[in-house]
């Protein structure tokens, strides 16, 4: 499945319990179509105690969400935006904001 965001992009969550929050993409899972976003979809994981390592605890961490629930955030527009592809004069393909034409 093709994912429209990349690692280190700033995105806005458009649906779900974290709607309206922004965060940076930490990891992209193209096979499942999910993304891991910093500070979004926090879940509690019950850590079992090991003999040699750590004690048991409840750890809060991010869980992956579907890529269709996020949109790229444009710093110039200060809003979530759709993206378009544009080919520059030197032949490189870049992503641009559909509203203000700023490159990402």
From Swiss-Prot:
SUPFAM superfamilies, sorted: Translation proteins SH3-like domain (SSF50104)
GO biological process: translation
Pfam families: KOW, ribosomal_L24
GO molecular function, one term: structural constituent of ribosome
GO CC terms, sorted: ribonucleoprotein complex; ribosome
Alphabetical list of Gene3D superfamilies matching this protein: 2.30.30.30
InterPro entries to which the protein is assigned, alphabetical: KOW (IPR005824), Rib_uL2_dom2 (IPR014722), Ribosomal_uL24 (IPR003256), Ribosomal_uL24_KOW (IPR041988), Translation_prot_SH3-like_sf (IPR008991)
Keyword annotations from UniProtKB, A to Z: Ribonucleoprotein, Ribosomal protein, RNA-binding, rRNA-binding
Family annotation (SMART domains): KOW
Free-text function comment from the UniProt entry: One of two assembly initiator proteins, it binds directly to the 5'-end of the 23S rRNA, where it nucleates assembly of the 50S subunit.
Subunit and partners: Part of the 50S ribosomal subunit.
Family of the protein in this entry: Belongs to the universal ribosomal protein uL24 family.
HAMAP family: Ribosomal_uL24_B
Name of this protein: Large ribosomal subunit protein uL24
Annotated organism of origin: Clostridium botulinum (strain Eklund 17B / Type B)
Taxonomy of the source species: Bacteria, Bacillati, Bacillota, Clostridia, Eubacteriales
């Amino acid at each position: 499945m093709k994912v429209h965001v990349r690692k280190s992009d700033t995105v806005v969550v458009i649906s779900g319990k974290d709607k309206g929050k922004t965060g940076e993409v930490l990891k992209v899972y193209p096979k499942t179509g999910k993304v891991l976003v910093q500070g979004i979809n926090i879940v509690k994981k019950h850590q079992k105690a090991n003999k040699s390592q750590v004690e048991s605890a409840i750890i809060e961490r991010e869980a992956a969400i579907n890529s269709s629930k996020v949109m790229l955030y444009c710093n110039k527009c200060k809003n979530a935006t759709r993206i378009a592809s544009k080919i520059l004069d030197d032949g490189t393909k870049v992503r641009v904001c559909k509203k203000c034409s700023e490159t990402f």
